[in-house]
Regions:
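Subtilisin-like serine protease catalytic core
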Residues: 1-82, 99, 132
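Substrate-binding/access-modulating region of protease and related hydrolase catalytic domains
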Residues: 74-174
């Protein structure tokens, strides 16, 4: 789903952007833009790290080379809280239709929100994740340089600290 383009059909129930399936993309039937701001390839790199099959140059493989991908090109020019929530709902719905579990990587480069899960967008996203089993959402960390947007915790010499903890009963980790 490209949330930025208008020359096509928006996915139901949304009223903006265009939706192209893999066959349309392979056949070159999806509209595109030459706008550098919309096509700077960050998503391509992230998708490669996540799911590259290793068939391209240098045979680099992603962490989940057999994964199916559902991609959304975000619209950052309008209400980001709406477009990110719509994107997450869209991806989970498509994965549900395919009968697949789903992990969403939200490396969108923004640091909006309350950072404590109390804002409405965070609550909506949490509700989408917990609506059914087999859903997870991860966010990029560390791209902010010296800006104060990092997860942090002061650890004393006498204190035990766990950054990641594996839930043995669920096969997942959290921090």
């Amino acid at each position: 789903w490209d949330q930025n383009l208008t020359d096509g059909t928006a996915p139901s129930p949304y009223t903006y952007g265009i939706e192209c399936d893999s066959a349309m993309i392979a056949d070159g039937l999806c509209p595109s833009t030459d706008d550098y701001e919309l096509n700077y390839s960050h998503g391509t790199g992230v998708a490669g790290i996540a799911a590259s099959s290793g068939l391209a140059a240098n045979r680099y493989r992603g962490v989940a080379p057999n994964a199916d991908l559902i991609l959304v090109s975000m619209n950052f020019e309008t209400d980001f809280n709406t477009t990110i929530t719509d994107a997450i709902a869209y991806i989970y719905e498509r994965a549900n239709t395919l009968g697949k579990p789903c992990v969403i990587n939200t490396s969108v480069g923004l640091y909006d929100g309350s950072h404590d899960g109390t804002d409405l967008t965070a609550q909506l996203i949490d509700a989408l994740i917990t609506e059914q089993n087999g859903r997870a959402l991860v966010a990029a960390a560390g791209n902010a340089g010296s800006f104060p947007f990092h997860v942090g915790y002061d650890v004393t010499a006498t204190e035990q600290f766990t950054w990641f903890k594996k839930l043995s009963y669920a096969g997942v980790a959290y921090f």
